[in-house]
Amino acid sequence: MRLFARLEVLAILACAVPIAAIPSFLSNSYPAHPAEGVSLFPQTQPQAPLGLWTRLRNTVIERLWRVPPQLNKNRPGKQGKFPLFSAPVSLRARYGDDVVLRFTIRNAEEVKALAEASNILFLDVWASTDEWVDIRLTKDVVPSLLGLLPQSLQTSHIPLIHDLPQTIYESYPSSSQRSSYDVQGFSPSTKHSSDITNIFFQDYQPFSVIVTWMRFLTSMFSSHVQIINIGSTFEGRDIPALQIGVWPANNPKPRKTVVVSGGSHAREWISVSTVNYVAYSLITSYAKSKHVAELLQQFDFIFIPTLNPDGYIYTWEVDRIWRKNRQETSLPFCPGVDLDRTWGFEWDGNITADNPCSESYPGEDPFAGVEAKQFSQWAKNQTAQNNIEFVAFIDLHSYSQQIRYPYSYSCLPNPPNLENLEELAIGIAKAIRLTNRETYEVSSACEGFMASQAKAKSDDPFPRIERTGGSALDWFYHDLNVKYSYQIKLRDRGSYGFLLPRENIVPTGQEMFNAVMVLGRFLSGHDGFGHLDWEDESQRPKADEDDIPSENELGENDDSWIPFDYRNHDDQNEGEGYDNDEWGFRRRRKG
């Protein structure tokens, strides 16, 4: 009965709305003009007649939710001319007139209305903060969305990405090869250039190249690197990882281990490249930096470039903005489980399990996601059988530049070591800021989906745009007792979203490498940032060795170690809410 009811509801909604989680095979039939209130699309295609399903959907929405019909009738852009795009026809056939809109939110009522409308229309929510929400949809659906929203939201949005197919096209490597692509048969290159100047981190890399690169590193640096297997994917692929560390012989103590994972969501390519960059920097710095050498003697590091190889490969071969894994669901046309909503701790899939087409579908049961279950079993086996003590977990995602600590599922319980979690998170944010002057916000993971009390001017937080139970962050922290667990959302703040240009790979990697160095220093019991190797070639900004004071020259809140380029930098407008004392490590651990 449950399955029948689910299919009945989905059948009705399928007639009323396009499903965002399904590749848009018919998207090139969508009209190309925006709704009222969206006047920033530069050039649009001539208006196409509405299809039968589109007209039926609009009628259902108008009658059930009382959408004013004029929103669908008086749409601008009828005189627009078709621009000359360089994106191939195959991409335009898949993504049609998809755009990304940013809605500015001001109160709880607006957030609730936006969340409900997104669920009704099966829209793809790209990111959300306490100030804005980014949503991907076709221009043809904009009138339906606006009709479900209050008047204030109908005018408080801007198009963030005007032309999704073009932006997707530009995210694939490589620009030098694009001229040879057949416009009618575009396929992104999966072969890395042999040019020595086109090094590994100058572009995003497909999974096959990443695995080959990992094996190469293992053979070149066998003294402190080995490749391991976390488990198998739904489609039978290995989930490879790099284990980095100097393993002492005959040591009965549990080996302290840090896990850095990326690519749970397939479309978040920058997280995959960043995991690789940090791993490479630690590996190659071992013989150059005494601080890195000390770190690898004290800790093992496990780097998992992508927990979701099936989905990652799918983003290269079929759909660049695919989010979930590729396993089967109860609806054959809606495959995939969200690998960051399927973990066993505070799994809330009983609320959303009826909609396999949702981008956040958690599966029908806890650990329904094959790769998440494999990862959890591997982690448990390591602690039970291999004398491993996990001391930190960093789960890299994109985008919005946030550092989040537990809990994700709710703001009501405070973590027992909340003060230490905040202290380390603030230290990581400072290291990032001093690397490339990028600002990352620090908050509990639940607050990442809600407005702060200061913004809401109330003790009641904003409602959630999407469910956040069943996260890897909460499971590692609570069930595996990993005291320092973080989810870090990388660059950018929405200009490109998941389609971050390749020029950001190295600077983002530099920021996270310094973040990991701060993490290691914190776990080692050191004060301040004295062991950050700013003179190391893997990090930025650069300074002469003589410019870095020794550890005993550093005071608790002394910033004299900062490279000369930043010593006179005005911090007043950065890191709002944190004074200079709050940025320093304040030695207040509670064990």
UniProtKB/Swiss-Prot annotation:
Q: Where is the signal peptide?
A: 1-21
- Binding annotation for substrate: H265, A266, R267, E268, R323, D340, R341, S398, Y399
List the GO cellular component terms.
extracellular region; vacuole
* Stretches with biased composition (Acidic residues): 544-559, 573-582
Glycosylated residues are: N350, N381
Cofactor(s) demanded: Zn(2+)
The encoding gene is: ECM14
- Alphabetically list the UniProt keywords: Cell wall biogenesis/degradation, Disulfide bond, Glycoprotein, Metal-binding, Secreted, Signal, Vacuole, Zinc
What this protein is called in its record is Inactive metallocarboxypeptidase ECM14
Cofactor info, note text: Binds 1 zinc ion per subunit.
Q: Where is the composition biased (Basic and acidic residues)?
A: 533-543
Family according to the record: Belongs to the peptidase M14 family.
Q: Which positions form S-S bridges?
A: C334-C357
- The record places domain Peptidase M14 at 203-523
The biological process GO terms on file are:
cell wall organization; proteolysis
List the SMART domains. Answer: Zn_pept
- A matching Pfam family: Peptidase_M14
Q: Where does Zn(2+) bind?
A: H265, E268, H397
One function term, GO molecular function aspect: zinc ion binding
Decide whether keyword Glycoprotein is in the record. yes
Q: Which stretches are transmembrane? A: none
Q: By its UniProt entry, which PANTHER family does this protein fall under? A: INACTIVE METALLOCARBOXYPEPTIDASE ECM14 (PTHR11705:SF147), PROTEASE FAMILY M14 CARBOXYPEPTIDASE A,B (PTHR11705)
Region Disordered: start-end pairs: 533-591
Q: Where in the cell is it found?
A: Vacuole; Secreted
Q: Please give the function described in this protein's UniProt entry.
A: Inactive carboxypeptidase that may play a role in cell wall organization and biogenesis.
Pro-sequence positions in this chain? Answer: 22-175
